[in-house]
Amino acid sequence: EELRPYNAYYADDTNEKKIYLTFDCGYENGNTPLILDALKKHQAPAVFFVVGNFISDNPDLIKRIVSEGHIVGNHTMTHPDMSGISSLDAFRKQLNGVAELYESVTGEKMTKFYRPPQGVYSTSNLKMAKDLGYTTFFWSLAYVDWIQNQQPSKDEAFQKLLSRIHPGAIVLLHNTSTTNGQILDELLTKWEDMDYQFHSLKELSET
Protein backbone atom coordinates (compact mmCIF):
# COMPACT_ATOMS: atom_id res chain seq x y z
CA GLU A 1 0.00 0.00 0.00
CA GLU A 2 2.80 2.45 0.83
CA LEU A 3 4.07 2.01 -2.73
CA ARG A 4 0.90 2.99 -4.54
CA PRO A 5 1.30 6.79 -4.17
CA TYR A 6 4.58 6.38 -6.08
CA ASN A 7 3.15 4.29 -8.94
CA ALA A 8 5.12 1.29 -7.66
CA TYR A 9 4.02 -2.35 -7.57
CA TYR A 10 5.13 -5.69 -6.15
CA ALA A 11 2.15 -7.59 -7.56
CA ASP A 12 -1.37 -7.17 -8.86
CA ASP A 13 -3.98 -7.20 -6.09
CA THR A 14 -6.35 -9.63 -7.78
CA ASN A 15 -7.98 -13.03 -7.38
CA GLU A 16 -7.72 -13.64 -11.12
CA LYS A 17 -5.10 -16.14 -12.24
CA LYS A 18 -2.88 -13.61 -13.96
CA ILE A 19 0.90 -13.78 -14.23
CA TYR A 20 3.16 -10.90 -15.26
CA LEU A 21 6.50 -12.15 -16.61
CA THR A 22 9.64 -10.05 -16.23
CA PHE A 23 13.30 -10.72 -17.00
CA ASP A 24 16.27 -8.81 -15.59
CA CYS A 25 19.08 -8.57 -18.15
CA GLY A 26 22.60 -7.68 -17.03
CA TYR A 27 24.39 -9.25 -19.99
CA GLU A 28 23.82 -11.85 -22.69
CA ASN A 29 25.13 -15.42 -22.58
CA GLY A 30 22.93 -17.11 -25.16
CA ASN A 31 19.72 -17.72 -23.22
CA THR A 32 17.59 -14.77 -24.32
CA PRO A 33 16.80 -16.22 -27.78
CA LEU A 34 15.54 -19.42 -26.09
CA ILE A 35 13.44 -17.33 -23.71
CA LEU A 36 11.97 -15.36 -26.61
CA ASP A 37 11.19 -18.58 -28.49
CA ALA A 38 9.24 -19.92 -25.50
CA LEU A 39 7.36 -16.64 -24.99
CA LYS A 40 6.42 -16.58 -28.67
CA LYS A 41 5.16 -20.16 -28.57
CA HIS A 42 2.89 -19.34 -25.63
CA GLN A 43 1.97 -15.84 -26.84
CA ALA A 44 3.12 -14.60 -23.44
CA PRO A 45 4.07 -10.91 -23.13
CA ALA A 46 7.03 -9.97 -20.96
CA VAL A 47 9.06 -6.99 -19.81
CA PHE A 48 12.85 -7.18 -20.14
CA PHE A 49 14.51 -4.82 -17.65
CA VAL A 50 17.92 -3.99 -19.12
CA VAL A 51 21.08 -2.16 -18.09
CA GLY A 52 22.97 0.11 -20.46
CA ASN A 53 25.57 -2.33 -21.73
CA PHE A 54 22.92 -4.93 -22.55
CA ILE A 55 21.51 -2.56 -25.16
CA SER A 56 24.84 -1.46 -26.61
CA ASP A 57 26.15 -5.06 -26.76
CA ASN A 58 22.94 -6.63 -28.14
CA PRO A 59 21.10 -4.23 -30.46
CA ASP A 60 19.66 -7.07 -32.57
CA LEU A 61 18.23 -8.77 -29.49
CA ILE A 62 16.65 -5.50 -28.38
CA LYS A 63 15.04 -5.17 -31.81
CA ARG A 64 13.77 -8.74 -31.63
CA ILE A 65 12.32 -8.22 -28.13
CA VAL A 66 10.41 -5.17 -29.36
CA SER A 67 9.32 -6.68 -32.68
CA GLU A 68 7.82 -9.67 -30.86
CA GLY A 69 5.61 -7.42 -28.77
CA HIS A 70 7.52 -7.26 -25.51
CA ILE A 71 8.50 -4.18 -23.51
CA VAL A 72 12.06 -3.14 -22.69
CA GLY A 73 12.19 -1.59 -19.21
CA ASN A 74 14.85 0.46 -17.44
CA HIS A 75 17.20 -1.32 -14.99
CA THR A 76 19.61 1.68 -14.82
CA MET A 77 22.75 2.44 -16.74
CA THR A 78 25.31 0.79 -14.43
CA HIS A 79 23.28 -1.25 -11.87
CA PRO A 80 24.28 0.74 -8.74
CA ASP A 81 22.60 0.69 -5.34
CA MET A 82 20.07 3.39 -6.18
CA SER A 83 19.13 3.96 -2.53
CA GLY A 84 22.50 5.68 -2.16
CA ILE A 85 21.59 8.22 -4.85
CA SER A 86 19.92 11.26 -3.33
CA SER A 87 20.17 13.84 -6.11
CA LEU A 88 17.56 13.95 -8.85
CA ASP A 89 20.25 14.78 -11.38
CA ALA A 90 22.29 11.62 -10.63
CA PHE A 91 19.11 9.55 -10.55
CA ARG A 92 17.96 10.96 -13.89
CA LYS A 93 21.37 10.20 -15.46
CA GLN A 94 21.06 6.52 -14.55
CA LEU A 95 17.69 6.26 -16.29
CA ASN A 96 18.26 8.65 -19.19
CA GLY A 97 21.41 6.84 -20.27
CA VAL A 98 19.42 3.66 -20.87
CA ALA A 99 16.53 5.50 -22.52
CA GLU A 100 18.89 7.25 -24.94
CA LEU A 101 20.62 3.99 -25.90
CA TYR A 102 17.24 2.35 -26.46
CA GLU A 103 16.08 5.18 -28.71
CA SER A 104 19.32 5.08 -30.71
CA VAL A 105 18.80 1.35 -31.40
CA THR A 106 15.03 1.28 -32.01
CA GLY A 107 14.17 4.81 -33.10
CA GLU A 108 11.39 4.77 -30.48
CA LYS A 109 10.91 6.29 -27.05
CA MET A 110 11.37 3.81 -24.22
CA THR A 111 8.38 2.72 -22.14
CA LYS A 112 8.81 4.32 -18.71
CA PHE A 113 8.98 1.15 -16.62
CA TYR A 114 11.71 1.05 -13.96
CA ARG A 115 13.10 -1.71 -11.76
CA PRO A 116 15.70 -0.76 -9.11
CA PRO A 117 18.81 -2.97 -9.13
CA GLN A 118 18.38 -5.78 -6.58
CA GLY A 119 15.07 -4.20 -5.56
CA VAL A 120 16.89 -1.75 -3.29
CA TYR A 121 15.24 1.64 -2.95
CA SER A 122 14.55 4.62 -0.75
CA THR A 123 11.24 6.47 -0.62
CA SER A 124 12.92 9.47 -2.22
CA ASN A 125 13.99 7.18 -5.12
CA LEU A 126 10.38 6.15 -5.69
CA LYS A 127 9.31 9.78 -5.70
CA MET A 128 12.07 10.69 -8.17
CA ALA A 129 11.07 7.84 -10.48
CA LYS A 130 7.45 8.98 -10.35
CA ASP A 131 8.43 12.61 -10.98
CA LEU A 132 10.35 11.46 -14.07
CA GLY A 133 7.21 9.70 -15.31
CA TYR A 134 8.20 6.12 -14.43
CA THR A 135 6.15 3.27 -13.01
CA THR A 136 8.33 1.17 -10.67
CA PHE A 137 7.98 -2.62 -10.70
CA PHE A 138 9.36 -4.93 -8.03
CA TRP A 139 8.32 -8.61 -7.94
CA SER A 140 6.45 -11.10 -5.78
CA LEU A 141 8.04 -14.33 -7.04
CA ALA A 142 11.71 -15.02 -7.78
CA TYR A 143 14.29 -17.66 -6.98
CA VAL A 144 18.08 -17.87 -6.84
CA ASP A 145 18.72 -18.23 -10.57
CA TRP A 146 21.51 -15.69 -11.15
CA ILE A 147 24.62 -17.48 -9.83
CA GLN A 148 26.33 -18.77 -12.97
CA ASN A 149 28.24 -21.70 -11.50
CA GLN A 150 25.42 -22.76 -9.16
CA GLN A 151 22.47 -23.03 -11.50
CA PRO A 152 19.40 -24.69 -9.97
CA SER A 153 18.35 -28.03 -11.39
CA LYS A 154 15.19 -28.20 -13.46
CA ASP A 155 13.40 -29.95 -10.57
CA GLU A 156 14.50 -27.30 -8.05
CA ALA A 157 13.31 -24.54 -10.36
CA PHE A 158 9.90 -26.15 -10.91
CA GLN A 159 9.49 -26.85 -7.20
CA LYS A 160 10.09 -23.20 -6.31
CA LEU A 161 8.25 -21.58 -9.21
CA LEU A 162 5.18 -23.84 -9.27
CA SER A 163 4.59 -24.01 -5.51
CA ARG A 164 4.83 -20.26 -4.98
CA ILE A 165 2.89 -18.93 -7.94
CA HIS A 166 -0.16 -16.86 -6.97
CA PRO A 167 -2.85 -14.73 -8.67
CA GLY A 168 -1.39 -11.41 -9.78
CA ALA A 169 2.24 -12.50 -9.43
CA ILE A 170 4.98 -10.38 -10.93
CA VAL A 171 7.60 -13.03 -11.69
CA LEU A 172 11.29 -12.11 -11.84
CA LEU A 173 13.59 -14.40 -13.82
CA HIS A 174 17.14 -13.67 -14.98
CA ASN A 175 17.94 -13.98 -18.67
CA THR A 176 21.44 -15.20 -17.79
CA SER A 177 20.11 -18.40 -16.20
CA THR A 178 20.80 -21.49 -18.31
CA THR A 179 18.09 -23.28 -16.34
CA ASN A 180 15.52 -20.63 -17.26
CA GLY A 181 16.44 -20.92 -20.93
CA GLN A 182 15.98 -24.68 -20.78
CA ILE A 183 12.76 -24.86 -18.76
CA LEU A 184 10.73 -21.80 -19.75
CA ASP A 185 8.61 -23.51 -22.41
CA GLU A 186 7.71 -26.32 -20.01
CA LEU A 187 7.24 -23.90 -17.10
CA LEU A 188 4.76 -21.79 -19.07
CA THR A 189 2.88 -24.96 -20.05
CA LYS A 190 2.69 -26.04 -16.39
CA TRP A 191 1.36 -22.64 -15.33
CA GLU A 192 -1.20 -22.78 -18.15
CA ASP A 193 -2.24 -26.23 -16.88
CA MET A 194 -2.88 -24.52 -13.52
CA ASP A 195 -5.26 -22.15 -15.39
CA TYR A 196 -2.96 -19.13 -15.29
CA GLN A 197 -2.87 -16.60 -18.11
CA PHE A 198 -0.02 -14.28 -19.03
CA HIS A 199 -0.64 -10.54 -18.99
CA SER A 200 1.39 -7.43 -19.73
CA LEU A 201 2.53 -5.03 -17.01
CA LYS A 202 1.01 -2.35 -19.22
CA GLU A 203 -2.35 -3.38 -17.76
CA LEU A 204 -1.15 -2.63 -14.23
CA SER A 205 0.41 0.69 -15.17
CA GLU A 206 -2.86 1.83 -16.75
CA THR A 207 -5.07 1.08 -13.72
Language-model features: locations:
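Active-site beta->alpha N-cap acidic-glycine motif
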Residues: E1-S86, N96-E103, M110-T111, E203-E206
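Catalytic grooves of carbohydrate-active enzymes
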Residues: H166-K202
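Histidine-centered catalytic micro-motifs
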Residues: I71-T78, G119, L173-T176
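Soluble non-cytosolic domains of exported or imported proteins
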Residues: G26-P33, S56, I85-R92, G119-V120, ...
